[in-house]
Amino acid sequence: MDPILQELVDEWFKLDQDETTRNEVSQLIKAEDYATLKQIMHPRIGFGTSGLRAEIGAGFARMNCLTVIQASQGFAEYLLQTVPSAAKLGVVIGHDHRHKSNTFARLTAAVFLQKGFKTYFFDHLVHTPLVPFAVKTLGTAAGVMITASHNPAAYNGYKVYWGNGCAIIPPHDKGIAACIEKNLTPITWDKNLVENHKLADRDFAVGLLKNYWSQLHEFHSENNFSLEMKSLKFVYTPIHGVGLPFVTSALHLFGEQGDMISVPLQDSPNPDFPTVKFPNPEEEGALDLAYEQADANGISYVLATDPDADRFAFAEKINGAWRRFTGDEVGCILAYFIFQEYKNVGKPIDDFYVLSTTVSSAMVKSMAKVEGFHHVETLTGFKWLGNKALELEKQGKFIGLAYEEALGYMVGSIVRDKDGVNALITFLHLLKRLQLQNLSITEVFEQMSKKYGYYTTQNSYFLSRDTPKLRALVDALRHYDTKSGYPATLGSKKITNVRDLTTGYDSSSTDGKATLPVSKSSDNVTFELENGEVIMTIRTSGTEPKLKFYICARGHSLEDSIKNATEVKQAIKSEWFHPQQNGLEEP
């Protein structure tokens, strides 16, 4: 064993008191599996704007009791340094059903209690949006949700919210990371401290949930979403997650309890997600059991939430075949419905805002131009959408929708983060409207396309365990052409603009500088082809070893837009990234 690895192992045994993870390391040493040992020990799991996310297991690079305690100590210390009366304001802590989630949540609570924080602890499983809602409602200094959302079963995570109810943005991530490095020695391992500590509140959840449902009902009623209508049957699946009781409560709230048929094999929380390869409704196969249930009952609609119920997915059966709508399509449909209802109740159009990210469909931008409402674009991630929504809210603006293409939707601003339950109930109201008009979602989307333009999005990724290679491949595009640096063409199409949010370059601005926030910690480059006929963004993932690309193509017809998107997708592979040559896996 090399000296650096030996030092890390010694440090691990000095700090870790969990017999399971101590034994994992001991077994690797006994087997002389130094390659795996090095992989789990270094580099330390990074704390970013998404908090922590990694596979569960021993080592400083993994999610385990020690790294959760260390993260909590650093976060608590950072709050004490930066937020006046942070301990008195307190923190909210919630968790989902994943392996070790309850243990990690209890250890997080123990650390904050030891640091003197009032600690609001959800005793039961919650869907992720309840934590930022609680932070906002209770006025706490921060919140922590233990979840890995829709990642595979081997993963868990530690998601952090600031006192404004939004996910954290820079520079908080770096500040917290620095405090973690200075607070590595555990101050407690007592998982039961939250049971009887005087600063622990485990009874707040009942009142908080009543408040959540009350605000949800009020928002939908005020904006004319929730008129009573005839029954509409649909199939719902939580994909082995926590969503079912929350969706059921939402249906009861609006008098719809008899309309839903569930998927028995996927109803209950199961951290192993046994019926799906990936518990992500974006992935092929994730909704197959729901389709089977719908087919068996003669139902044309499937609605789903991801395991922590912050994302929402929809599929419709048309002409005997299932169509799973993309996140962009659902986002545009929701924006259209919410705006129409807002307009119908006579509210001022100039106050209506829809927010989306740089990698979302351009259709919503076209819709805003045609209809006269405001559209604002942010960087990728709800941390940016939530904070921008809050900024506009303070100006008295109405946030109709904020969305990102990865099935994340914030309807209104009850929660300043994506909420799959609120999105689902909103979409259900839309379906009931269309039922009265004898229209399908597919038909409505065709009407929208004729009015706002035919747009096709094709999003995918390359997977590699060699993260530096992914960054190097993107960096090579900055030196692709000897004259301008960036490529001048892709396939048969001319590249007319480039925006690089890693370097801060934007060819479309007068001074060549980007107006959106710049970050050197990850890659984010947008190429505009043929003056907006195709907009494509390439970015490295903050939570996964992926190089993601997002293509939005416009055309004179659906077929034309698909053709444009497909040409660009193929050219990315054949001209820029050469997957086989570079050892990149495709989904």
From Swiss-Prot:
SUPFAM superfamilies: Phosphoglucomutase, C-terminal domain, Phosphoglucomutase, first 3 domains. It is found in: Cytoplasm; Nucleus. Keywords: Carbohydrate metabolism, Cytoplasm, Glucose metabolism, Isomerase, Magnesium, Metal-binding, Nucleus, Phosphoprotein. GO terms for biological process: glucose metabolic process; purine ribonucleoside salvage. The keyword Magnesium applies. It is an enzyme of class 5 (isomerase). Converts ribose 1-phosphate to ribose 5-phosphate. Involved in ribose salvage via the pentose phosphate pathway. PANTHER family: PHOSPHOGLUCOMUTASE 2B-RELATED, PHOSPHOMANNOMUTASE 45A. This is Probable phosphoribomutase.
